[in-house]
């Protein structure tokens, strides 16, 4: 593969301030960030010849594979996407609320806003509009300005209530929808009828219980929140037990096609310190 080295520029400006308000004590951190890439390296999912691992990017590639008695597989290949800009802001605070010397509430809250932009998306769309081969792979699932597999918003909160040797905690995480995925997985461009790639997707990813990969993703690529709980007790200085429930409400969500997150999970953990 002819991959150029990725070059970039990064700048970040922010401030961190301590605070004490009554029994609250902690820090607040605010930062803005900007990153610019040239020849940014991204991976692209596609169909590959199982014999020589070359990407199938045309009908002639597919015919040659079949006539040579070879098969195909799904894989990913790194390549340059030219220019990209990623910028945004991050706000966080962490600290403790002191009820008394034996009882405390620890907290950590954070929010990130990101603009992950493909700076060359217009030129790429113009070039892809000229494609005539129905098997020629496009960069992503839509014609938007955003890079693949990235959300715009994310929020996370961690709270731990501690009383003597007992700890009760919770995690809350929220993310907005993913802005774009690979073209091999789905095509969000408006069209009047199915094309060859739609049939290829059906063969590659299957069809189950009335769902295709695209219909499942469209249904589940939405903003989602998850909640985790934990209860711990320190039996001695050396031994501690913790019981955790991850994904408390058994939220069904997917952070990328073909990757369904874990359902509700129960974990019992013992820590021993020597």
Which residues make up each language-model segment?
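Short, mixed-charge, low-aromatic patches
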Residues: 27, 64-65, 223-228
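Gram-negative outer-membrane beta-barrel transporters
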Residues: 23, 31-36, 50-184
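Flexible glycine-rich, low-complexity coil/linker segments exposed to the extracellular/periplasmic environment
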Residues: 1, 45-79, 189-218
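Structural signature of Gram-negative outer-membrane beta-barrels, strongest in the C-terminal barrel
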Residues: 1-36, 236
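Switch/connector loops and helix/strand junctions flanking conserved nucleotide-binding motifs
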Residues: 39-43
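Conserved C-terminal beta-signal and adjacent last beta-strands/turns
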Residues: 4-6, 10, 86, 104-112, ...
């Amino acid at each position: 593969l002819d991959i150029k080295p990725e070059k970039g520029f990064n700048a970040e400006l922010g401030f961190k301030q301590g605070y004490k308000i009554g029994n609250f004590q902690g820090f607040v951190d605010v930062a803005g960030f900007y990153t610019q890439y040239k020849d940014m390296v991204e991976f692209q999912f596609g169909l590959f010849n199982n014999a020589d691992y070359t990407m199938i990017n045309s009908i002639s590639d597919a015919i040659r594979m079949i006539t040579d008695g070879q098969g195909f597989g799904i894989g990913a290949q790194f390549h340059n996407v030219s220019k990209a800009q990623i910028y945004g802001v991050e706000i966080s605070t962490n600290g403790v609320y002191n009820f008394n010397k034996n009882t405390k509430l620890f907290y950590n809250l954070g929010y990130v806003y990101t603009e992950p932009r493909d700076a060359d998306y217009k030129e790429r769309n113009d070039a892809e509009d000229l494609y005539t081969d129905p098997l020629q792979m496009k960069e992503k699932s839509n014609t938007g300005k955003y890079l693949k597999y990235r959300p715009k918003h994310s929020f996370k909160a961690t709270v731990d209530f501690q009383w003597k040797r007992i700890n009760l905690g919770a995690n809350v995480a929220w993310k907005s929808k993913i802005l774009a995925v690979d073209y091999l997985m789905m095509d969000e461009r408006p069209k009047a009828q199915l094309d060859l790639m739609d049939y290829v997707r059906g063969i590659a990813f299957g069809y189950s219980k009335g769902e295709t990969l695209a219909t499942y993703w469209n249904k589940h690529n939405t903003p989602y929140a998850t909640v985790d709980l934990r209860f711990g007790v320190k039996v001695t200085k050396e031994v501690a037990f913790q019981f955790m429930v991850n994904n408390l409400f058994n939220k069904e969500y997917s952070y990328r096609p073909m990757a369904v997150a874990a359902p509700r999970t129960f974990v019992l953990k013992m820590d021993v310190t020597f």
